[in-house]
Each structure stands twice: as C-alpha cells, then as structure tokens.
C-alpha cells in the first residue's frame, strides 16, 4: 500500500462527506467548497484557514487482529471503512475515543481514521498528542500479547485542521473534492464546530480554494471557546474522567459496545445519570498576571466557595473543571502574585439541550 493514498471522490457518510482512496497518482488540484444548507453558503468566497498541528502525530495500527485489538482498549466503536459502490474502494471514516487506565481515567485522547489496507482487512491511523506518541505505543504493546497487529509511527502524513475564516460558519460550510493529493479529508468527528481534519504530505493551504496558513494561536483559541479539550494539557493522563471531559458530547463513547479497559466506572457513571462536574470553556475578564494562570488553580465564587479547578488555556480563554450548578455567578481565581482574576464560564451552544 502506498504511504499516502490519494483522494478519489466524495460519498455521503455519518458525520459528513468522506473521501475514497485510490493508489495511483492524481493531478494536484484544489478542493472546492459549497454549502450544506438550503439557504446558501454564508462563507461563499471566504478563505479557509489551514492550521498545521505539529502537536499532533499519527500511529499506524494494522494487521488481521487490529480491529478486535483496539475494540478492547477504546471507549468507542471503530470507524470502519464505509461500503462503496461496485468497483470502488471503501471510503475512509473517522471517529473519536479515549484510552483509559484500569481505574477508568483518561490516558490518551485520539481521533481514529479507519482505512481499508487490502481485501477485507482494515487498518487504522491514530491521531494523538505528539508528546505521548511513545507512551501510547508502549501502552498498545502492553496489551498486544500474541495478536497479529503492528503498531508504528506514521510520519509520512501531517495533521491539519481546516476551518472557515468565519468561525460561526463552521457548522454550515463544507468542502467538496475535485481532485487532490491528500490522503484523508474528513469532518472532525467530535463536533461540526471543529471543521475538518486533513492528513496530507503536502501543505494544507495548497489543497483548499482560498486556503491560507492559519495562526495556531487562533486554532487553540477557537477550540477553547468551543469547549473542546485536546491533548495531555487539557486531559492529564490518569487524572481526567472521560464523562466529565464531555466525551459523550463529542461522540467519543459507546455504551452498547463490548468490554474495554476502564469501562466499569464510565458505565456506572452513565447509568447513574448524573454528572455533577464538567469541563467548561472559561474566559478571563481581567488582565492576566505575567506568570499566567497555573493549571489546577482553584476557581472560587464571590463568597470564596470552591467551584472547581482551572485545567489549561491560552491567552484569555481556557477550560476549567467546574460544578455545573455553580457556574452562573461571578467567579475568580487567586493568581500566584496574589491578584484576583475574574472569569466567566459558558455553555457551548452545540452541547445537547439537556446539559444547558
């Protein structure tokens, strides 16, 4: 199999269009965009921002036992390649999931890309935080035992995020393929607000009409405003709980699949039906101290009651693990210099109504 298969055409799939693979060369052209909504594309003529995510990397998992092997470790079903028309290769699919430890706490968050390696054998690319690629590879090796599975880094492809230049258009704008040299272009499986994921050997802006190189700062600002955790800063290994981290909201857990490592606590919490704390997006209302806000800093109400803890952020936005019933009043953090920094928590409008 070629190290980077090429796009052929779009087919409808769960979560948006997906792209079929082919293995012979194609002329390098751009991808067109059009509206998904009846009212027309609100971003018509607007540029797409392409963010190169050097903090994300890929592991390749393949072999006859790859699917059952991963099913026993992940919180979600696998994104198996979609059925395709006669004579055409199956379409790639993406999914989101966490690896948990035996206590049921998150170790690593991953976006999975399901590929057809060859006849009736599926392979997977696991997108993970670059800083824990080696640790994740060792975690997989620990449980591999005698299964016919290979796990190896896949540096041939780079990870890009693609967003409309107008952030409010994320749920409406779409991309359509004409021809291209990208391996995978697919909607982010976590939420439509996070746009598209692009895995390619080429530069992302070269594949998108009006594409421009985005500032990574803007990507993380957008991500935090949408309440989407990503990587070990937002989801500390062995600390974060999957449902408190909104894994269910981001399509990252199945409560009907078979057993997996760490399932017991997650299933019990789900069936109790009450999740009292969640990761919420927060915005700081006061200037930040020069040293910034320390991860784990206590969030307090005006009366000094503890509401939760700051998790991570960038600039004046971030994520905090807060008691859901206490987020509406004035909140603040006592910074290391002794200053009191006001902040406000919000509920993303893409969350299920029942959670608001």
Curated annotation (Swiss-Prot):
Keywords: Acetylation, Disease variant, Heme biosynthesis, Hereditary spastic paraplegia, Mitochondrion, Neurodegeneration, Primary mitochondrial disease, Transit peptide. It is found in: Mitochondrion. The modification N6-succinyllysine is found at residue 309. Signal peptide: none annotated. InterPro entries: TrmE/GcvT_dom1, YgfZ/GcvT, YgfZ/GcvT_CS. Residues 1-39 form a transit peptide. Changing residue 146 to A: Abolishes interaction with ISCA2. SUPFAM superfamilies: Folate-binding domain. It is linked to Multiple mitochondrial dysfunctions syndrome 3: A severe disorder of systemic energy metabolism, resulting in weakness, respiratory failure, lack of neurologic development, lactic acidosis, hyperglycinemia and early death. Some patients show failure to thrive, pulmonary hypertension, hypotonia and irritability. Biochemical features include severe combined deficiency of the 2-oxoacid dehydrogenases, defective lipoic acid synthesis and reduction in activity of mitochondrial respiratory chain complexes. NCBIfam families: ygfZ_signature (TIGR03317). This is Iron-sulfur cluster assembly factor IBA57, mitochondrial. It comes from Homo sapiens.
